[in-house]
A protein has these predicted regions:
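Active-site region of glycoside hydrolase catalytic domains
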Residues: 1-199
Length: 199
């Protein structure tokens, strides 16, 4: 779905290939479709928020797109506490795809992170899975940079556990654990890892 926004914004028009065939019906219903040139903008940078890939399979019974998601657990691949697939190679391919559109001056990774079932034990949160996640995804960024992609920044999601719009306080993305009742902050091992990595 990213293509529906980024391609017109980069002056490529709306996608017209087989994978987005359902757009033909929308195109016929939308009289402004021919004015896609008005959507083109000369961006200073493209901000990329990446968490996980979505794998779908054909389904005639799903309206419009005729596809349904195949969850990571079903496919027996690594996933987070939210069921999101962990796939740094997909992150790398997404960065490259955006860069190869042409006309992109810079890419900034504005969000990248994962929620895991963090447990506070004896004042310590050993979130090794989050550290592995960041290592894998930073390797993807470095690989893309070495291949000429102009990546100017990377923002880890997030400093502290916070309120998620659709999930409340249950998912924990932070490098710092927050006890919602007492407001006590505890730096997770991933927080210390980032400190050491940046030094």
């Amino acid at each position: 779905m990213n293509r529906l926004f980024i391609e017109p914004a980069l002056g490529k028009g709306y996608p017209a290939d087989e994978s987005l065939k359902f757009l033909e019906k929308l195109q016929l219903q939308n009289k402004t479709w021919k004015y896609t040139d008005r959507l083109h903008f000369n961006f200073d940078f493209i901000g990329l928020q990446y968490y996980f890939p979505v794998v779908v399979k054909h389904n005639n019974y799903t309206p419009v797109v005729q596809a349904t998601e195949v969850k990571a657990a079903t496919r027996k691949v690594p996933y987070t506490a939210m069921g999101w697939e962990i796939n740094a190679d997909s992150f790398y391919r997404t960065i490259k795809k955006i860069w190869l559109y042409g006309g992109v001056k810079e890419i900034i990774i504005t969000e990248n992170g994962a929620a895991f079932k963090d447990e506070l034990k004896n004042g310590v949160i050993d979130d090794a899975a989050r550290i592995d996640y960041f290592k894998q995804h930073l390797q993807a960024v470095l690989k893309a940079k070495k291949e000429g992609v102009n990546i100017k920044g990377y923002f880890a999601r997030t400093l502290m556990d916070n309120f998620e719009w659709s999930e409340g306080y249950r998912p924990r993305f932070g490098l710092v654990h927050v006890d919602a009742k007492t407001q006590l902050r505890t730096i997770k091992k991933s927080g210390y890892w980032w400190r050491d990595f940046l030094q």
